[in-house]
């Protein structure tokens, strides 16, 4: 079993924020792969399903971004999993908008949701970094991260999220390179 956690803030007023792109990714994966209905569990919302032959628990922590690790840690301990069995989808300022990078381990790079996750489960989990771009000046970062995607970005957002969902089987199989490569090819078309 694997846990795939999407980071974001709960509630409708945050739904389209760039900071919630991890939640959006989980929603698309659940829809595209026919996951079970949402249940309230582990201080958040979960959906169970299969991607290929792998059982996956999608988790959207309800603890707000800065405490995301509490929910992820609780789910990981309940299922007696290791950090290597956890994948976290989140927004990344240091990547161009709609670019995807996968990495394992490392620090938080200023991301409070990742910092919380590290605090609760350690560093050795897989991260799906979803680019939101940097607004240019550090004074504009908070407004950018906590701002909605612009109308002009909606098509690119939908295309990127669809690519994540369509290529999720490579993640489930542990083929991170193929996941990134196939997403890049889809987004070029």
Swiss-Prot record:
Molecular function, one GO term: tRNA binding
Active site (catalytic residues): 19
Keyword Nucleus: no
InterPro entries in UniProt: Pept_tRNA_hydro, Pept_tRNA_hydro_CS, Pept_tRNA_hydro_sf
Residues annotated for tRNA binding in this entry: 14, 64, 66, 112
Gene3D superfamilies linked: Peptidyl-tRNA hydrolase
EC annotation from Swiss-Prot or TrEMBL: 3.1.1.29
Residues at the site labelled Discriminates between blocked and unblocked aminoacyl-tRNA: 9
Site (Stabilizes the basic form of H active site to accept a proton): 91
GO cellular component: cytoplasm
Enzyme class: hydrolase
Main location: cytoplasm
Catalyzed chemical reaction(s): an N-acyl-L-alpha-aminoacyl-tRNA + H2O = an N-acyl-L-amino acid + a tRNA + H(+)
Family: Belongs to the PTH family.
Subunit structure, as described in the record: Monomer.
Record PANTHER family: PEPTIDYL-TRNA HYDROLASE
Name of the protein in question: Peptidyl-tRNA hydrolase
Source organism phylogeny: Bacteria, Pseudomonadati, Pseudomonadota, Alphaproteobacteria, Sphingomonadales
Gene: pth
């Amino acid at each position: 079993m694997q846990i795939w956690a999407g980071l974001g803030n709960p509630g409708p007023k945050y739904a389209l924020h760039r900071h919630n792109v991890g939640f959006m990714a989980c929603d698309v994966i659940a829809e595209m792969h026919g996951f079970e209905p949402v249940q309230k569990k582990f201080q958040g919302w979960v959906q169970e399903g299969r991607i290929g032959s792998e059982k996956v628990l999608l988790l959207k922590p309800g603890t707000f971004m800065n405490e995301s690790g509490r929910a992820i840690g609780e789910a990981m301990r309940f299922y007696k999993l290791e950090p290597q069995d956890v994948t976290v989808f989140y927004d990344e300022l240091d990547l161009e908008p709609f670019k995807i990078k996968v990495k394992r381990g490392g620090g938080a790079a200023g991301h409070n949701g990742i910092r919380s996750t590290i605090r609760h489960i350690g560093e050795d989990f897989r991260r799906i970094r979803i680019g939101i771009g940097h607004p240019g000046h550090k004074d504009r970062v908070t407004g950018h991260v906590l701002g909605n995607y612009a109308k002009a970005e909606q098509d690119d957002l939908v295309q990127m999220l669809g690519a994540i969902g369509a290529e999720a089987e490579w993640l489930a199989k542990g083929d991170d390179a193929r996941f990134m490569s196939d997403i890049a090819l889809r987004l070029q078309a």
